[in-house]
Amino acid sequence: MKKVLAIILGGGAGTRLYPLTKLRAKPAVPVAGKYRLIDIPVSNCINSEIFKIYVLTQFNSASLNRHIARTYNFSGFSEGFVEVLAAQQTPENPNWFQGTADAVRQYLWMLQEWDVDEFLILSGDHLYRMDYRLFIQRHRETNADITLSVIPIDDRRASDFGLMKIDNSGRVIDFSEKPKGEALTKMRVDTTVLGLTPEQAASQPYIASMGIYVFKKDVLIKLLKESLERTDFGKEIIPDASKDHNVQAYLFDDYWEDIGTIEAFYNANLALTQQPMPPFSFYDEEAPIYTRARYLPPTKLLDCHVTESIIGEGCILKNCRIQHSVLGVRSRIETGCVIEESLLMGADFYQASVERQCSIDKGDIPVGIGPDTIIRRAIIDKNARIGHDVKIINKDNVQEADRESQGFYIRSGIVVVLKNAVITDGTII
């Protein structure tokens, strides 16, 4: 795998994940209590023995840069690296990234200097575990110019993805990005060609691109240089290339979830608490998901009732009830609280007991969840200060609302409390 260079696309402004992306790049969004989204593709690369990794981003890169610098510091004796390349304006190109392909094109001058055979293009907002070695091996065996990782998919979600048709050899012969209506119907195929049973094929009659590609180095350089107006892999580069290049499909048959929206992100996090087997586990001895070592103390539970939940390290919980929830590192929950079906991202720092008491004495609200508060079906971003006897329950069953001045948004019926927000005592949302 020394001849492979990985390029992780950090995505655009993250509007679908807003307000979680208000103060951070999409790959830096916390997930599963202690990780960040970027940890997933980077860990997959490391476990696949791919150690040359670039992350392309253009919005709010500071926390992403900090996380990567603290986490993925390879020894000076190896040529491995994880490096963030932020969008930049130059005299030759005064524009920001215009799309996924344009992001790679703008750094092509640097990427093409590497002595590699393939470029592996990955997305920064997917939850999955994959051995890219098998993917690249298939690419080489079929002498493909481009190989796409694909999954079979059902009618309900098909129009959200790039869909394709393949021949018996696995070659892509038609590709359509997010088709609707009649165009969608035309992309139905017999997915038994991927190895599905007739029953599975009947319920999943489409072949969807996961947004994970491997290109021959010279093919990618040629495609990007000869068509400067094409800015997106899924919409333009791949459909056009499938007409006159050997574009192959590689079936990925394990758990994979695109968590680029608030609802999908919320559901994927809470699914980690499912019994008896969650659809995805961050623990795998053979292929761990890495993140920054924080050296926090174990979590302290004082007379708490906790069911079907994940609790990060360094938390302090007092006489509360936690059900079907995920609590991030350094979460602090006071007496009498009820947390149900919620994702709490925790805090970036501890407040000492003396400091907390001083805050309370001055009438300020300390970081964490105050006494007798009820939180249900919500996402609480980092460092939120939630007061005494607050109810975050979406009492009016609102589906969408922008209340930034009050410290929260509602997306798909899920209340999202902003990072560093202050919710005063007695507030009912």
Swiss-Prot record:
Enzymatic class: transferase
GO molecular function terms listed in the Swiss-Prot or TrEMBL record: ATP binding; glucose-1-phosphate adenylyltransferase activity; structural constituent of carboxysome shell
Binding residue positions for alpha-D-glucose 1-phosphate: G162, E177, K178, S209
EC numbers for this chain: 2.7.7.27
Keyword Membrane: no
Catalysed reactions, semicolon-separated: alpha-D-glucose 1-phosphate + ATP + H(+) = ADP-alpha-D-glucose + diphosphate
Pathway as given in its UniProt record: Glycan biosynthesis; glycogen biosynthesis
Job of this protein: Involved in the biosynthesis of ADP-glucose, a building block required for the elongation reactions to produce glycogen. Catalyzes the reaction between ATP and alpha-D-glucose 1-phosphate (G1P) to produce pyrophosphate and ADP-Glc.
The family this protein is said to belong to: Belongs to the bacterial/plant glucose-1-phosphate adenylyltransferase family.
Name of protein: Glucose-1-phosphate adenylyltransferase
